[in-house]
């Protein structure tokens, strides 16, 4: 049977045994990819600096998902938080990868078995002897089983009752660790940044799924609904399954891009909105004011700022700074962060403190402008020196560093001051190693950006797939060219076509 590439799936349309076989093979490929990708990432991952070179800077994609579910140790003797590990146990990163690869092999064998032994009695209607599936019953079974799994995940894994819990951190991504989570049953459970909502929603959705599954197993659909929604046609299953998948893809694209308790910044990197709103800058400022209230010097106050917090407040970690065709990890862009130089404080010759205006997310270049506390422009790096009034040289701008590697060092040389003013546009100033990875200096996106782009794109494609297959199954008689006023009911069977004399006819 010569089929074009876009029609090949018709071979399993009326063949339940081989329909199972191809789904088993698909699951084998997914599981095998997950395990293989995990092993590849573990081979290239450098766990030595979880503060300045975390997994998301290195472009890791599956390691963050394992970590948020409670995996933190490696058979290589390291932990994601930086400690040395002596006994990682079976549920290490490598252990999870191996389990996926073994599962992939077993699914591969199962797929072959079902392809060979496709004609099972299980799939034949006792009355007609023809291949058939009780799709509403199968729907009930799947709904029940997925409900059990969903409930078990929320009630046992997330709560720590039988499992590790999940990755929990503070809003600024400083104190993350795996710990059990109590379900949040109040209104706070609907806050996407409250981890307790993950437990309570899985428990509630699981119970709903179990009840709905039992309902569909015990109650048959009315005949008009069965016919109206084409419940006897396997393409209806395909259409509604695609709908479930694209809906889920749109949801997770949103929770990833805008941030949520399920996508911690320690594992996936900060969101673009944290840069846009000065989220980390405000927290740093609050801590500095708090330290000054305790009569600490500026140097002491800035030295108390965690390097991790300062690193978040750097535009190169903004996932929206990457470009669509800039492949690779963040480290391949601006380089591997080596150390924080400290906070640069600029002053004019009168001693007034000046603040460098930060670059907005969607700018590649931005004028260097220094403003005072009232937001009035006091200095800049002019485009045309002939017309300049506020140049660094004219205003006499100096820079002094507090905290970090250059703590207490000041510069008055205009060229050096301008260099640090340009770098201060990008947030806190860090030293980068661009030689090791031959980094090109062009910003890359984090896994947060890639995940969002991928899932939003595929969700859109799958949306069209849902419309396509839904229309095909709902309007199958129209597409087949059958007159709706025909007085004989035409039953569709295997390889049936219009005008086939063997078609069963039943007078209405």
From Swiss-Prot:
One GO location term (cellular component): photosystem II
Full protein name: Photosystem II CP47 reaction center protein
Co-factor: note: Binds multiple chlorophylls. PSII binds additional chlorophylls, carotenoids and specific lipids.
GO biological process: one example: photosynthetic electron transport in photosystem II
Pfam family, one: PSII
Family recorded in the similarity comment: Belongs to the PsbB/PsbC family. PsbB subfamily.
Molecular function terms from GO: chlorophyll binding; electron transporter, transferring electrons within the cyclic electron transport pathway of photosynthesis activity
Role, per record: One of the components of the core complex of photosystem II (PSII). It binds chlorophyll and helps catalyze the primary light-induced photochemical processes of PSII. PSII is a light-driven water:plastoquinone oxidoreductase, using light energy to abstract electrons from H(2)O, generating O(2) and a proton gradient subsequently used for ATP formation.
Self-association state and partner proteins as the record states: PSII is composed of 1 copy each of membrane proteins PsbA, PsbB, PsbC, PsbD, PsbE, PsbF, PsbH, PsbI, PsbJ, PsbK, PsbL, PsbM, PsbT, PsbX, PsbY, PsbZ, Psb30/Ycf12, at least 3 peripheral proteins of the oxygen-evolving complex and a large number of cofactors. It forms dimeric complexes.
SUPFAM superfamilies assigned to the protein according to its UniProt record, in alphabetical order: Photosystem II antenna protein-like
PANTHER family (alphabetical): PHOTOSYSTEM II CP43 REACTION CENTER PROTEIN
Membrane-protein topology: Multi-pass membrane protein
Keywords: Chlorophyll, Chloroplast, Chromophore, Membrane, Photosynthesis, Photosystem II, Plastid, Thylakoid, Transmembrane, Transmembrane helix
